[in-house]
Amino acid sequence: MTEKMTRMTQFVKEEIANAITHGIGAILSIPALIILIIHASKHGTASAVVAFTVYGVSMFLLYLFSTLLHSIHHPKVEKLFTILDHSAIYLLIAGTYTPFLLITLRGPLGWTLLAIIWTLAIGGIIFKIFFVRRFIKASTLCYIIMGWLIIVAIKPLYENLTGHGFSLLLAGGILYSVGAIFFLWEKLPFNHAIWHLFVLGGSAMMFFCVLFYVLPTAS
């Protein structure tokens, strides 16, 4: 009984940490979304507003669904929140791609990659609906591969984002990828909360890259 209580206590502590870390992300995502929309409205076209909105909303949903999953434990909603949480990862990946592909790259390459990424994201969401608690390692690998598909357009991205913007993009990708190691490291105490911190860091890098370099004020 003591061992069981110890495990339960540790579980509660870790879930509190998980909820707090991404709860902070959910709160910060609200002003981030507002800033993105205002910035795109002032300095971009209608397509920029759409792209920035899609990105901002996808970021907010990821943190919202994650916070709900780790905050509310009830048999009737746990599976639903798990599906929403895992699906939101696909949404964030595709949502993050959207401003880079619609604004930074544009043209045939941008539209082609956009179609591919959103098709993969939709396929991943459908997969999660049926297999949300299975193939976790394979799903994590899929997230990473999707995130790094942008490497096929590395040259035009670097040229358009400049060195500083590209550095932020690269830093964000690295933080997301390194964080996945902790996500899979289940024996490490608070591994999930540590992963959440890497996700927050990756989101911050991507946000500032989109805000300052995808649609510079000077343009």
Swiss-Prot record:
Q: Where in the cell is it found?
A: Cell membrane
Similarity remark: Belongs to the UPF0073 (Hly-III) family.
Task: Please name the InterPro entries in this protein's record.
Answer: AdipoR/HlyIII-related, Hy-lIII
Where does it sit, as one GO cellular component term? plasma membrane
Source species: Bacillus cereus
A Pfam cross-reference name: HlyIII
Q: Where are the transmembrane segments?
A: 19-39, 49-69, 83-103, 112-132, 138-158, 165-185, 194-214
Q: Which UniProt keywords apply?
A: Cell membrane, Cytolysis, Hemolysis, Membrane, Toxin, Transmembrane, Transmembrane helix, Virulence
**GO biological process annotation, one example:** killing of cells of another organism
Give the chief site where it resides: membrane
Q: Which residues form a coiled coil?
A: none
User: What membrane topology is annotated for this entry?
Assistant: Multi-pass membrane protein
GO MF terms listed in the record are: pore-forming activity; toxin activity
Give the highest taxon in the source lineage.
Bacteria
Q: What name does this protein carry?
A: Hemolysin-3
Q: Where is the signal peptide?
A: none
Primary role: Might be virulent against a mammalian host; when expressed in E.coli, the soluble extract has hemolytic activity on human erythrocytes. The activity is not inhibited by cholesterol or activated by 2-mercaptoethanol. Might be pore-forming protein. Its in vivo role in virulence is untested, nor has it been shown to be secreted by B.cereus.
